[in-house]
Design a protein with these regions (language model features):
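Aromatic- and Gly/Pro-enriched helix-to-coil junctions and flexible linker segments
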Residues: 1-121, 138-139, 143, 211
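Post-cleavage N-terminal segment of exported redox proteins
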Residues: 1-11, 78, 91-142, 217, ...
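Residue-identity detector for threonine
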Residues: 8, 16-19, 32, 40, ...
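Sec/Tat-exported extracytoplasmic proteins
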Residues: 23-24, 28-31, 50, 54, ...
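Axial heme c-ligation environment in periplasmic c-type cytochrome domains
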Residues: 32-40, 56-68, 72-98, 130, ...
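Short glycine/threonine-rich turn/loop motifs
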Residues: 34-57, 119-217, 282-353
């Protein structure tokens, strides 16, 4: 109906909140009461629905790029709420108005997450091209480059950031587990530093909120770079201060000199430049129809149809969520589990993670 006015962002958000609370909360909000009788009669289906629902989208947590893509996909294929739910909860099927409001709300929320990073033109889609560059301070980038390659950040002057994140090896060291000071082996492999700027969290267990927090981890790790306590940044600063020329150059940008805060800030600023724009697929997303083959275009349509974007979303096509490793098979067959295999739970301390 052409006379129907489009919803404002506020209206879409209000309708979405009402709809979720009335039609989605049973499975997507913690604390849902489970009737033991109904669960038994359903063969455990009720409990599984609630478990899987809260794994997919927890309504009490702020929406992320991944949860937005998941919501968008199930709305597009009309799979939520599932038939097994609507059959016993009359009136829970989404109306067209509710569905359209939720789709608009999803785009509005996605714009908040990626708008400044990739621009409004691309932020509304589940996938976005990697931007040509991120805003950075060139002077800080230059200092960060030097620190990224500086072995003096380690106790025995043998390990730098680049030791485990070699730019000649796709931002990694190509080893099952990385080698730290005194030839010690870490418990997990080094993730690539390329496009890490787009990740929602840093480290495999998400314990760092951003690049700067991540940069502060390895120097204070007894296995990786050898230091252990926050006060040890003073020892690192003392070593760097012995390099008079570098210290003078550094103070021109950071008047307070070498500290844990300034060192990690410079490294993070440099890491923002380690992005990979203008791949053929990036160019295709920007509108160049000739950038990829017809077969690749078919593959992208299949990618969207099957819901691959519900995990592989954003400009880096991933790095936005923590997924359950038990969904498709036993990833730990043939070896003993280690503490690192706990993933997010090591940081969150939640058994559900």
């Amino acid at each position: 109906n052409q006379n129907v006015k489009p919803l404002t962002s506020a209206q879409a958000a209000e309708i979405t909140a009402q709809t979720m609370n009335s039609k989605c909360a049973d499975c997507h909000k913690p604390g849902t009461h489970i009737s033991e009788l109904v669960n038994t009669l359903s063969g455990g289906l009720l409990a599984r629905h609630i478990r899987d629902g809260q794994r997919s989208y927890n309504m009490e947590e702020p929406p992320t790029a991944v949860t937005l893509s998941k919501l968008e996909h199930v709305l597009q294929i009309n799979s939520m709420p599932p038939t097994s739910y609507t059959m016993v909860h009359w009136g829970s099927t989404l109306t067209l108005r509710e569905k359209n409001a939720m789709l608009q709300w999803i785009k509005d929320e996605r714009l908040k997450i990626f708008g400044d990073m990739v621009g409004e033109e691309y932020a509304l889609s589940p996938l976005a091209p990697i931007p040509d560059a991120l805003p950075t301070d060139p002077a800080k980038v230059a200092l960060g480059y030097k620190l990224f390659h500086d072995v003096r950040l380690s106790t025995d002057n043998t390990v730098s950031c680049a030791s485990c994140h070699s730019l000649e090896k796709a931002g990694t060291d190509n080893l099952p587990t990385s080698t730290g000071v005194r030839s010690q082996k870490g418990g997990i492999n080094a993730p690539t530093v390329f496009n890490a700027a787009f990740h929602a969290k840093q480290f495999w267990d998400g314990r760092a909120a951003n690049l700067q927090e991540q940069a502060g981890g390895p120097p204070l790790n007894p296995v990786e770079m050898g230091y252990e306590h926050p006060d040890d940044w003073k020892k690192i600063a003392a070593k760097l201060d012995q390099d008079t020329a570098f210290a003078v150059e550094f103070k021109k940008v950071y008047p307070q000199g070498f500290t844990g805060e300034t060192i990690t800030n410079a490294i993070a600023e440099y890491e923002k430049t380690l992005i990979t724009p203008n791949s053929p697929f990036d160019r295709y997303l920007k509108g160049d129809e000739n950038a990829i083959s017809e077969n690749a275009k078919k593959g992208y349509k299949l990618f969207l149809k099957l819901g691959c974007q519900t995990c592989h979303t954003g400009p880096a096509m991933g790095g936005q969520s923590f997924e359950y490793a038990d969904l498709k098979g036993d990833f730990f067959a043939g070896r003993a589990k280690t503490n690192d295999d706990n993933g997010l739970m090591n940081f969150s301390k939640k058994e559900s993670d």
